[in-house]
Amino acid sequence: MNKRTVYRYLILISLITGQQALLAQKQVKPVPPLYSEKGKLIYTPDQLGNRIPDFSYCGYKASEQPIPNIDVKVVVPVKAGDATLRIQSALDYVGSLPADANGFRGAVLLQKGIYEVLGQLRITASGVVLRGSGVHATTIVGAGTGRLALIKIVGKNTIEKQLSGLKITDAYVPVNAMSFHVDQSINIKDHSDKIIIRRPSTANWINLLGADHFGGGITALGWKPGERDLFFDRTISKIEGNTVYIDAPITTALDTTYGGASIYFYNNDGRINNCGVENIKLISSFNKANPKDEDHRWNAINIENAEDCWARQITFQHFAGSAVSVLETSKRITVEDCISLAPVSEIGGQRRYAFLTTGQQTLFQRCYAENGYHDFAVGFCAAGPNAFVQCESILPFSFSGAIDSWASGVLFDVVNVDGNALRFGNRGQDANGAGWSVANSVFWNCSAARIDCYKPPTAQNWAFGSWSQFAGDGYWNESNNTITPRSLYYAQLRERINKNVDAQAQIMDVPTEASSSPSVDVAQALTKEASKPKQQLKDFIAQASARSKISIAYNNVKSIDEIGIPQKIKPTLAPALQIKNGVLVRGDELVTGKRSGVQWWSGGLQSKDIQQAKWHITRFVPGRSGKGLTDNLDEVVTEMKATNHVAIEHNYGLWYDRRRDDHQRVRRMDGEVWPPFYELPFARSGKETAWDGLSKYDLTKYNLFYWTRLKQFADLADQNGLVLVHQNYFQHNIIEAGAHYADFPWRTANNINNTGFNEPVNYAGDKRIFYAEQFYDLSNPVRKELHKKYIRQCLANFKDNNGVIQLIGEEYTGPLHFVKFWLDVIREWEKETGKHPLIALSVTKDVQDAILALPAYAAVIDIIDIRYWHYQADGTAYAPKGGENLAPRQHARLLKPKKTNFEQVYRAVKEYRTKYPTKAVMYSGDNYPEFGVAVLMAGGSMPVLPETIDGAILKAALGMKPVTSTNANEYVLSDGKSSIIYNSETRKFERR
C-alpha cells in the first residue's frame, strides 16, 4: 500500500468519525414563536419584529368586562297572530328612554311561549336588549316566506372609506404592533379619537402573492390594486408628539415596500352600541315538502354598524344562511353559548354559514353547529383580530376557516370540526378569486378531519396542538398532542388584564391523564371512566343558563299593550297609471322621465362592483342590503325620484350565479355559487342536480322571493307615481353564446318537468346556441302548458297594481305565432279575472304591424313600443324581421344600422299615434333618451325630458295632438284652441 492510498484511508476515517461526532451532538432546537413557561406565555418575534398577535381584544368591551344583565323596562305578553308590530313597538319604546351612566336604556322581555313574527325586528338605538324567558321557554318563529333576517342590530354607516390621510412614517410596523409614527404631530383635541388605518393593496404586493392571476392566462378574477385594502378600525389610546398608540393590535404588517399605510379620523355618530339578543330560541318556518326550501328566513341575527354588542344563550333552527352574521361595519361583538341546528337550504355557496364575521374584534365562544357549510367563517379582508373559542361543527358540508380574501389575525382556539376541514390557505379562483384567504392566524388545540395551514408571502400562519391529517407549509408545533394552556385566548386575556378570567372562559376541562404507560390504578380508574357518557360541548352549552344566569325578573314594569302600540299608517296611492287621449298619464299629468334597465349578469361584492352596480329588483345577497346587494327598494324609489327616473325595466337574470360570468358551458362540480345572485322566476325543486350544482328547477312552481320583490316594487311604484316595465321573457338565454343556455331553467338538464329540449345540447361549433325556434315552438304540449302557466303568473302577480306595463320579453325578435299565443293567454286571463293590465307590443316591425292588423289581437294591445326597429336619419327603416333566430345585436352586425335623428323619431311615433289613436306609443329604440322631446311632440308616451321643462307645458300637452307645421323646424301640439310649439333649432318651447 503506497503512501497516497494510506493518506486516503486516513482522511476517509477522519471524515467518518467526524461526521459521527457531529451527529452525536444534539442539534439546537429552534425557539418556538410561542410557548408556555411556568404558566406564562413567551413570544419569539421574527427578525422584523412580527409575532403571534394578542387575540384577546375581541368581543364585548374587548373582553375586559363581562356581559351585564340589563333591567327589564317593558314586557311583551304572548298573543296569537303576528307579533312583529308589538315587539318592534317595545324595542322602539325602550330605544326612546334615556340611557343610564353605562349606556343602557333597558331590556324588552318576551314571556314564555311562542311569538310568530312575519316581519323583521330591528334594534336601531344604543342600549337596547331583546331578552327571552329562556331557550326552552321563549321562541320566536320567523314565519312567512320572506328572506329577511329575523333580527337586525343595526346602526347607520356614517364612516366613509378614504384613500388619503396622515401618512404612517415607519418603514415597517410589525404584526401585533400597537403604536406607530405619523408624518405630523396630532393634537387629539382637534380630532375624534376614532381612526381608520388603511393598508393599501399594491400591485407589487399582489404580484408577490401570485394573486394577480389564478390560471388559464385569464386575469379577470385576479386581484387588482386597491381591491384588497385593509381598514383597521381603532381608537387612539394615547398620543405623544407624532407617535400614535392604539387600543388593539395590527394583524397585518404595514410595510412601505408595499405602500405603507395611512390613518384618517372619523366620528362614531351612526354606529350603535350596548345592544344584545339573549335567552331565547329562534326558528325559521319553511316548506316541509321541500327539504332544500329557500323561501324562508336566511339569517337569524345580523349585526351591522354596531360595536360592543352581543348574542348569547340562543338556539337557532332551520335558517338557510347564518345563525349570526357580523358585518364588516361592526366590531367588538360577542356571540356565546349558541347552537345552530337543522339548517334548511340548498347545499352550496352563501348557505349555512352558521357563525360568520367580516367585522373586527369578534368573539365567537362556545358555539355549536350541525350540518352547516362554512360553520365558523371569517370573510373578505376582515382586518382582525377575530376569534373562535371552544366551538364545534358536526358533519358540515364544507370547511371552517377563512373563506374569502386576506382575513388577518384569526384565532381558532379549541375548535373541532367533525367530518370536514379547518383551512388557512390559498383559495385561488374560488369564491370569485379569493386567493390567499388568511394571514398571521393561529390554530390552537384544534381537531378536524384535515387541517390546512399554509404560509402566504409576507406573512405567516401557525398551528399548535393539531389533531388531523395535515397539509401546508405554515408553522406546525406539537401536532398530535394536546398542549397547555388549553385556551390561548384566555391565557392571553388573563395576562393582559392581570386577573382571573375563568368565569368568562368556561372552558370544558379535560380532566384525565392520557399517558401511554399508566399505572395499574390509573388504568383501572380510566377504564371505569370510559364507561360513562362523554361530556359533549352541545350539552355544555345547553347548561349555560346555570353558569351565567340571565335574569327575567321585573318589578313595576308595564306591558307594551298598556303603553300603547302605534297603528300602521296605510300608504297613499298616486293616481292610477292609465291611457288618456292616447298617452300614459297618472291623474292629469303626463308620465315622463328616464328608464333604467337592470343588471342581468356580472357583478361582485367588492367596493368597485358595488359602485358600478345598477338597480336590480330581484338581485339577492344573503344578509346584506343596499346598492349592488339586495337592493333596499325604498332607497331605490327615493333615488329614482331624485334622479328623474320614472321606470325600471325588469327582466330576469341571464344566469343565477357569478361563476357563469366566465361564459363557460361546463357542468359545475359543486354548488359553490358566487353572489350576487340574480334570482330567476322558478323555484328550485330540492331534487336532483342542475348544471350549476344546486337542485333542479320545477317550472310549475315559482320563486317566491323573485315574485314578491317585483310585487313590492310595483306597490311602491303605485304609491310614488313610478312604473315597472315587466319583461316576461329574456331571449338572451336561447341565442348567441352557449353559456347563456347552460344554467337556463327551461333547459332539460336543469328542471324536473321534461321540457324535451335536446340533451346533451347541440351547441353550434361547440360554443353557440340556436334554440330560439325550439323555445318558441308550441307543438310540444309540455312546454306549451308551462308557457301558459308562466304567462298567467306574470299577470296574476300584479293583478292589484296599475303601474305595471307587460312586455313579451327583453330582446324579443321571435316569431309572430308566439306573440299571438302570448296575447291569447292574456285575453283568456283578462276574461276570467275581469282585470285589464297594460299590455305593450314590443317586437320587430313586421310582427308589430301584423299583430296590429288583426283586430282581435290589436284589441289586447294598449301600448305600441318602438324598440327593435327605427327610421334611420336618411329616412329608410332599419327593421330586422322577426323569427329569423337572430338576436338584436346579431341583426345589427348583418344590417349595420345607421343612427336615427329627431325628425325620424318624431315620424315613427306620430305615424303609429295617428294610425292607432287610442293606443299609447313609446319609443325605446336607437338612442331613445336623447329624443324625448321628439316623442312628446309626436304625441308619444313616457318621454325622457329635460328636468327644466315648464310643468305648465306638460299639463297643457295632455289634451293635445300633433299637427303638421309649415315650418320644417317647428313641431306642434294643438287641441284646436291653443298650441305648444317646439323649435328644433333653438330647442325652445313656445305656447300660443
Regions found by a protein language model. Give the residues of each.
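Aromatic- and carboxylate-lined catalytic core of secreted/periplasmic carbohydrate-active enzymes
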Residues: 555-575, 889-992
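Glycoside hydrolase catalytic-domain groove-lining segments
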Residues: 817-926
